[in-house]
Amino acid sequence: MHQYELMVILDPEIDERTVAPSLDKFLNVVRNDGGTIDNVDIWGRRRLAYEINKKSEGIYAVVQLTATGDTTKELDRQLKLSEAVMRTKVLRADEAIAQVAAAQKRADEKAARKAAAAEKTVTEKVGV
């Protein structure tokens, strides 16, 4: 079993009070296969970066769970069949951490190059 993170964007037309119970229905797939739900974090209504199904907002939810790969595939399949679900993304937690670390490393390297270039420019101006 592995740790996974699931992000779901739900249709903004559904009532926000029904988000948790409807998610719980889907998460029973994980529980029935012997997995566990570690954390459910409902972010609420947020503006989308781009329109999905002609909608500019969505209700975001992030779920941390422990399950097998087959269980997460079945969960993702069932979520995609629901009309209330606009988008889903399932990531293995260790892969997500590696992606964040790689992005941070690239940002640090870029900042270091920028600082070195700025220092070189200042040194050249002072030396002239």
Swiss-Prot record:
Coiled coil: none annotated. This is Small ribosomal subunit protein bS6. Binds together with bS18 to 16S ribosomal RNA. GO terms for cellular component: cytoplasm; ribonucleoprotein complex; ribosome. It holds the Pfam family Ribosomal_S6. GO terms for biological process: translation. One of its GO terms (molecular function) is small ribosomal subunit rRNA binding. InterPro entries: Ribosomal_bS6, Ribosomal_bS6_CS, Ribosomal_bS6_sf, Ribosomal_S6_plastid/chlpt, Transl_elong_EF1B/ribsomal_bS6. It comes from the Bacteria. Keywords: Ribonucleoprotein, Ribosomal protein, RNA-binding, rRNA-binding. SUPFAM superfamilies: Ribosomal protein S6. Belongs to the bacterial ribosomal protein bS6 family. CDD domains: bS6. It comes from Leifsonia xyli subsp. xyli (strain CTCB07). The gene is rpsF.
